[in-house]
Amino acid sequence: MSDSLPHLTDRLYLTHTGAETDLIFRRGVDLPEFASFPLLETDAGRAVLSAVYADQMAAARGFDCVTILESPTWMANGARAEPLGYDKAQLQRANIAAVAFVADMAGAQTLISANLGPMADAYGPAAHQDPDIYHDYHAQQIGWFAQTAADMVSAYTVNHIPEAVGIIRAAQDLRLPVVMSFTVETNGYLPDGTPLAAAVAQVDQQTGAYAAYFMVNCAHPDHLPPDFTALERVRGLVANASRCSHADLDNATALDDGDPAELGAQLAALRARAPHLNVLGGCCGTDARHLRAIARAVLA
C-alpha cells in the first residue's frame, strides 16, 4: 500500500507504539532493556505479540480505518541491543524477521512501518553529534529494512535535530519513504529546548524536505505547543495516555492508562481543527481501548 501513505490521502490512519507498556503492565511480559523484538525468538513471545497486533487491527477494522503496523524494532539498533547480547549478524536477522512477522499479519488496509528508535536514551541528556554520525549509525538498520516488505521507515521518539537529519538522509540514500516523529516535554518543546516548529523547519531545510511527514509521539495532548495544529508538515500524533512527564514515566512502577474516552475526544478535537492530522494513535500506557476510543471520537 505504499501508494497510499498518509500524506497522500485524507483517510484516518490508526497506529500504536505502546506495545511495550501494554506487554509489561497489562500482559505481564518481562522486557529486558524495554526491547520487544526478542519475543520473536519463542513461540510464547510470538503469540503475545500476535495478540497485541490483532487487537490493534480489530480496533481499526471496526471503524474502517487504515492500520499502520509498527515492527517491534524500536530498540533493535546496535548500541541499544548490545546489552541483550546481539551481535551484528543476529541483529540483522532479528530486524528482517521482525518486519516479516508484522507483514505476515497484515491484511487489507494495512501499512507496514519499519520502526526505529534513537541511538541513545530518548529521554536522557545527550550531547548532540554531527548529523553524519547519526546517518552512519542508523544506515545499518535502515539498510536491513530496505530488504523487507516495509512500506516506510518510521523514526520514533527522536529528541533533537541532528539525529533526525541523519536518519532522514540515510533513508533518502535508499529512496525509502521515511516518517520523523519527535517527542516533546510537558512544555511543548523538544527535550533540548528547541520549539517543534523550528525543529521541523530546520530538518526540512537540511534534508530537502525529504521526509514524507512529521509526527509527535510519547506526549499527552495537553503538552503540545500552541501552534501544533498550524504545522501542516506534522500529520500525526501518537499520544501517551498519561499526563506525566517523561522522567516520571521512566520511574513509574504502575501503569497510568489515563482515560481512553478523554484521550479520544482530545485527539478528535485536534483533528477537527487540523484536517491534515490523519495519523493518530497511542503510545505509552495505551492499548486497544484507547485506539477504539480515538477512532470512535474522530469518526463520529
Language model region names:
Residues 1-300:
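Domain-level signal for soluble alpha/beta catalytic cores
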